[in-house]
Amino acid sequence: IGGDEAERGRTMIERVTIRRFKRFNEVTFDLPGHIVLAGPNNTGKTTMLQAVAAWDLSLTRWKQLNDYQRHGGSYAKAPIARQAFSAVPLRAFDLLWNERRYSGSIEIEIQSKKGWTVAMELIADSTEQVYVRPKPQADPQTVRQAQLSTVFVPPMTGLSTAEPVYQRSKVDQLLWQGKPGDIIRNLLVEAHQTAAWNVLKDSIQRLFHY
């Protein structure tokens, strides 16, 4: 989606910093605007997108605690089971950690163009569960206001001939299973209900004359 209208209505990411996540020990991506990630295989394009999706999932799950105060200098931890971790398909949580060193925490920090910066911790527990919470550097008001809606759609292997209407939890589950072709129509319906849909149509018309 491009254009100033889309930027006014949505949270735009300005910078992503990843620590101990999959192939990266520490790396920062500066995102100056609407971008396309391009490059050879195994250079981290998908990893960066998965990190953003993991940040969104972690913050959303943590906010369900409805506890925005620090306790002893840190925020409370919220558990996430492997089966509920829809951001990245996993057979065990140690696959998220750099070189599979499953200890300590992963940190994913997002800085938005709206001025807030929030780093989320993913804390090792077992192969079937992690804990998540914001880093304490972000004050409670910032954490409360921070919001980023993401959908990471992996490469498709084919479209289903029939597709029922799914609840959002089922959509997330099928994405986690690597089956975006089973829910692409649901994703389009969801996108159609937002103000950005007309901007997307205009962009497709301008770029592809379709």
PLM region spans:
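Low-complexity, highly charged intrinsically disordered N-terminal segments
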Residues: 178-194
